[in-house]
Amino acid sequence: MAIKKYKPTTNGLRNMSVSSFAEITTQTPEKSLLVPYKNQAGRNNQGKITVRHRGGGVKRKYRLIDFKRNKDNIIGKVATIEYDPNRSANIALIFYADGEKRYILAPKGLTVGTSIVSGPNSDIKVGNCLPLLNIPVGTTVHNIELKPGKGGQIARSSGASAQIISREDKYVLLRLQSSEVRKVLGSCRATIGEIGNEFYKLINYGKAGKKRFLGIRPTVRGSAMNPNDHPHGGGEGRAPIGRKSPMTPWGKKARGIKTRDRKKSSNELIIRRRTK
């Protein structure tokens, strides 16, 4: 994927960039794989905000993605590469030999007409899915399961991948892009290759309105709020925060504090913690 930049003919276009969508082959999604998508605006089932700065945005439908890749030993052919408004990665529509259609995350290098297959005996080829124990050390993978049969949970966004660095008994050691090294059961599945659309993170939205189209609402500084809304709020004019360290809106220390639960059961599977 390439990035397309605009000439600064208006204030909104100055510094703005968009994806060239050169890899996209159709603008019409597969109807049988679309379901309604309700915008929760960052609220939970009690109506309370659990994720800030969410809401609004254009109406969209959810594309049903096959994260499990459990259709074994049936060859599928890539019919289209499509844009998905619900994620940063592109998706590929697969026509299987038995007539079924499924969407998968489109890895880098996957093109229309390419054949893919899932199963323990699959070839080590981009787009194929197989258990981690059957994949050679040094291979780059994505859409990695944490529990066998649950579906991929790691390395699913644009440009994401992990590398297999060794095997230990029933576990496989993965190096993630965050530099974290962790154990994953060898019976968990992963797909060969890295996710495409890798330049997505370089896109400059250019104006606030474009973020609103995506359902992203403004982020207000704590120092601009009242003291009953944020620990940084209040004071006369541009007052300092008046605390030893920056605080979250809920009064907890922000920046530089480890937020992971010390008693989390999966801590023993993390060999080296992430550095970024």
UniProtKB/Swiss-Prot annotation:
Organism superkingdom: Bacteria
SUPFAM superfamilies membership: Nucleic acid-binding proteins, Translation proteins SH3-like domain
Keyword tags: Ribonucleoprotein, Ribosomal protein, RNA-binding, rRNA-binding
Any matching Pfam family: Ribosomal_L2
CC per GO annotation: large ribosomal subunit
Coiled coil regions in record: none
Function: One of the primary rRNA binding proteins. Required for association of the 30S and 50S subunits to form the 70S ribosome, for tRNA binding and peptide bond formation. It has been suggested to have peptidyltransferase activity; this is somewhat controversial. Makes several contacts with the 16S rRNA in the 70S ribosome.
Family: Belongs to the universal ribosomal protein uL2 family.
Protein name in UniProt: Large ribosomal subunit protein uL2
